[in-house]
């Protein structure tokens, strides 16, 4: 696997592949890779001739008092895992390469509406940071296809909307959430959990599953939400949000809506965990 921090190196290699008529897949990450990331790379390798991965802890998407400095950086282990999974080109830029004028002077991309609710309301500016870095990475790598995890459901919709609105010629593929044996969605932030918290963490998925089951049986959204919040609090969580939304617009769920998604974010100790479930009523 070729590794470089330099934009020109990435473009040169991708151009060489394109000159051969070969296809390129892209998986953007912030590193500290787990099996969920590796699954994205393996799926990318099945779909395209070559796989490019980026590792960049993006300062633009972290708010004040968030864990930018504490975010784990494990480049050596990540490189080994990526090589084994079939990645051929790894882009590891520094903030100075990505944002040479600094964040305050950086042109940014903002996806209106869908960026402002749920995680966007809890973390103002987060999705502006996500959309900007993903758009910038797309312009550097120029992939045919890009892969993202369905675990970050709102992020995936923000990126799909950006690609559509800006007419970017890139196919976006969402890959099912990879879970630990307990049902806990894999996340780099799971490393913040104590053993006791890790034992309690599967309650998040159980609460979401119970909500979906209740809605399918005709129980009101208000009732299933209150019951789920109570179960999370009893398990030691501090809920941030727990909501039922339209699956493609993230508008509040209406009685006539069939395609729904439950989205949850909750604190367990130091870790902010998110999860979701898309289902038909």
UniProtKB/Swiss-Prot annotation:
(R)-pantoate binds at residues 61, 155. Its EC number is 6.3.2.1. GO terms for molecular function: ATP binding; pantoate-beta-alanine ligase activity. Its main location: cytoplasm. It is found in: Cytoplasm. GO terms for cellular component: cytosol. GO terms for biological process: pantothenate biosynthetic process. It catalyses: (R)-pantoate + beta-alanine + ATP = (R)-pantothenate + AMP + diphosphate + H(+). The reaction proceeds by a bi uni uni bi ping pong mechanism. Belongs to the pantothenate synthetase family. Homodimer. This is Pantothenate synthetase. It comes from Shewanella sp. (strain MR-4).
